[in-house]
Amino acid sequence: MWNRLYQYNEEERAIRIKTYFKFLFVREPLKRLLSAYKDKFIGGDAQLSRLDRRYIINKYRPQDLNKNENFVGFAEFIKYFSEDIPRNQHWRQYEKLCHPCLVNYTFIGHLETMAEDAPLLLKTAGIDDRVTFPPIHASTNTDEVLEYYSQVPTEYTKRLGELYRSDFEMFGYEYLGAVKPLLRHNTSKEDNSNR
C-alpha cells in the first residue's frame, strides 16, 4: 500500500525528504519499551516474538528451552535488551529508527500529549478542515510503569537510560523521569543497607 523511502532511488528519496510534509510522534522511552514488551510478549503476535522468546530463555534459563515454559518476564526482557540491544523497530532508539538529525521533520508530537498535538498536526498540515482525529486514550499509566520497572534491578534501568539518553534529550523527556520515584526509593534502600 505504501512505499518505504528505501524503495526509491537516491534522487527520488531526496525529493521526498525535501518536499513532503514529514511528521513524527514519539513516546517516553521507558513507557515505549514497556508497551512493546506487553504487545509482543504478553499479547499481540506470538510469531513475531517467538525467536526473541527462545533466545531469551536459552540465554537465561536454558533448562526451560524445550519445556512448555515460554513466558518471558519483564525483568528478563530488560536484561536481554540492555545487554544485547536487539534490532527491532518496536524498541529501537528513535535516533536510529527515524533519524531526526538527518530528516527535517515539519512536526514532532508526543504520544503523551497526542490529544493536544493531533489537532495541531492537522492544522499545520493544512487538512484540519477535512480530517479529524478519533478520540485518544492513554495506554500506559504511571502506576503500571512503576509496577513493571520495580521488577527490574536498578543497574539495568540505569543502563536503559544510557541506551535511550539521546531520545530523552532530543524530545524533551526528563531523563529516567517515568521511574524516578522508583530509583529514589531503591537508592535510599541501598544507602540504608550500607550503614
Question: Where are the language model's segments positioned?
Answer:
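Membrane-interface amphipathic segments in extracytoplasmic regions
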Residues: M1-R195
